[in-house]
C-alpha cells in the first residue's frame, strides 16, 4: 500500500496535529437519540493542553449552568441549583454522561493517542467517499487507558479522522464514531459532526456538532481552578 513513505505513527500524528493547539474553545451541540425520544444539549468548552478542560452546559434550561472541570487527574462537577461543587470519583469517568453515549472521560479527558497507543497500518478503505488509511491502535503496557483497541480511518488527503471503532479489554466492539460535515473550523478543515453509535443498541446514538472552534486563544491556568467554576459563563 502506498502511504507516501509515512508510517502509521506519522499518519496518526498528522491527524492529531489537526487538533494540535495550546488551547481550544468550542461551541458544541450534543443530540441524544433514543428509540422513543431525542434530547439536545448545548455546551461551551475550553481546553488547555492535555491536562485542563472545562465544559459549561448552556441548555436545556434545567441543566443550564452545570459545569465540568478536568484539572490534571481531578474531575469536578458544579451544580448551580445547589451552588455546590462535587469531586467526581474516578470510576464515574467510565460511566455514561448525562444520558449520552459518551463517558465523562470522553468529554473531559484529552489524551494524546500517540503517547498511549502503539499504531499499526492495517490497510485502506473508503469512508463517506474519501480514501482513508486504516490504523489499528493497541495500548502501550504502561498506558492507563479505557480501551483495549481502537481502529481509526484517517483521510489520505487532509488527514481528517473520519471513523473510529472502540473495543473493550476483551476486544468486543463498544462504540463506533463516524465523522461528517467537513468544514473550516478555526482555520482547519475538520469533521464538524461526530455520530457515536453504541454496539448492539438499535436506534440509539449521540450526535456531536461543533458549531465554532477557536485555536490558540490565550487562557490562563487560573481559569481552570475549582474556585472559578461558579463564575464561568459562555
Regions found by a protein language model. Name each.
Residues 2-23, 29, 38-39, 67, ...:
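Flexible, processing/modification-adjacent segments and terminal tails
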Residues 20, 47-49, 158:
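Short loop/turn positions at the edges of beta-strands in beta-sheet-rich folds
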Residues 25-54, 58-62:
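N-terminal, post-signal-peptide region of Sec/Tat-exported proteins
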Residues 26, 53-57, 75-79, 85-87, ...:
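Short hydrophobic/aromatic-rich beta-strand segments that constitute the beta-sheet cores
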Residues 43, 122-123, 197:
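Beta-strand-rich interaction surfaces with strong enrichment in secreted/lumenal proteins
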Residues 44-45, 66-70, 152:
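Broad, structure-driven detector of short, well-ordered beta-strand segments within folded domains
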Residues 45-49, 71-72, 91-94, 180-183, ...:
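A short, sequence-level motif marking secondary-structure junctions
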Residues 108, 128-225:
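Gly/Pro-enriched, hydrophobic low-complexity segments
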